């Protein structure tokens, strides 16, 4: 379980959120919503331990995140707004970098992400959407329980969004957890996703 307790965050003398508390249990996914500058990416960075809140605490499995960073990061898949891939490597080589023990599974993961036939193309030659798919192919390889995804559908077409949404639904059905930001609808998942709305100084579930 991931828990946020009474989080407070300020940026440039402006309160993004205060008194923000919620939990994400096994089998749940949460969509963080809010306007530009509401603090969506900032919240994800706090939840992953990439930044510290100005007040409050994040807990993982009942322990303060700052005390269990190693075990937490073994359980975490974080894909930020930037793909975080190496453009001089091929799609296959990028996945191998993150998942060196899964060589036999890489082609299937890339195919699931819509990159069949592009496995050995240097990422620098791929479109923005294809580069995003290289990063998202990790969803078919990772064993992490918690997925935190910042705008995963950027530059992804409708069919790709549907495929990725099904993968997230399968992950939560198996007891995984997903937290994501997106402005796009989640096809077929509207009834199962909790929404956390950041409203500037507060939030509502």
UniProtKB/Swiss-Prot annotation:
Top-level taxon of origin: Bacteria
Cross-referenced CDD domains: ABC_CcmA_heme_exporter (cd03231)
Residues the record lists as binding ATP: 34-41
GO biological process, one term: cytochrome complex assembly
Cell compartment(s), UniProt: Cell inner membrane
Recorded topology in the membrane: Peripheral membrane protein
Keywords: ATP-binding, Cell inner membrane, Cell membrane, Cytochrome c-type biogenesis, Membrane, Nucleotide-binding, Translocase, Transport
GO cellular component: plasma membrane
InterPro entries named in the record: AAA+_ATPase (IPR003593), ABC_transporter-like_ATP-bd (IPR003439), ABC_transporter-like_CS (IPR017871), ABC_transptr_haem_export_CcmA (IPR005895), P-loop_NTPase (IPR027417)
Record-listed E.C. numbers: 7.6.2.5
Primary localization class, coarse: membrane
Domain ABC transporter: 2-205
Gene Ontology terms for molecular function: ABC-type heme transporter activity; ATP binding; ATP hydrolysis activity
UniProt entry tagged with the keyword Cell inner membrane: yes
Family: Belongs to the ABC transporter superfamily. CcmA exporter (TC 3.A.1.107) family.
PANTHER family for this protein: ABC TRANSPORTER I FAMILY MEMBER 1
Quaternary structure and interacting proteins, as annotated: The complex is composed of two ATP-binding proteins (CcmA) and two transmembrane proteins (CcmB).
Protein name from the UniProt record: Cytochrome c biogenesis ATP-binding export protein CcmA 1
């Amino acid at each position: 379980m991931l828990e946020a307790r009474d989080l407070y965050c300020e940026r440039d003398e402006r309160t993004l959120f205060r008194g923000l508390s919620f939990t994400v249990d096994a089998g749940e996914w949460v969509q963080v919503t809010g306007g530009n500058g509401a603090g969506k990416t900032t919240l994800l960075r706090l939840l992953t331990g990439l930044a510290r809140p100005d007040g409050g605490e994040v807990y993982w499995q009942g322990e303060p995140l700052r005390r269990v960073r190693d075990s937490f990061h073994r359980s975490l898949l974080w894909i930020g707004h930037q793909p975080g891939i190496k453009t001089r490597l091929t799609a296959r080589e990028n996945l191998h970098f993150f998942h060196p023990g899964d060589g036999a599974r890489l082609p299937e993961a890339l195919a699931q992400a819509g990159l069949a036939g592009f496995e050995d193309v240097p990422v620098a030659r791929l479109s923005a959407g294809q580069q995003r798919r290289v990063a998202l192919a990790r969803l078919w390889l990772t064993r992490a329980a918690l997925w935190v995804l910042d705008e995963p559908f950027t530059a992804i077409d409708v069919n790709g969004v549907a495929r990725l949404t099904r993968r997230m639904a399968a992950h939560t059905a198996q007891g995984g957890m997903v937290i994501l930001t997106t402005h796009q609808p989640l096809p077929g998942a509207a009834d199962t996703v909790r929404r956390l709305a950041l409203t500037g100084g507060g939030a509502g579930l």
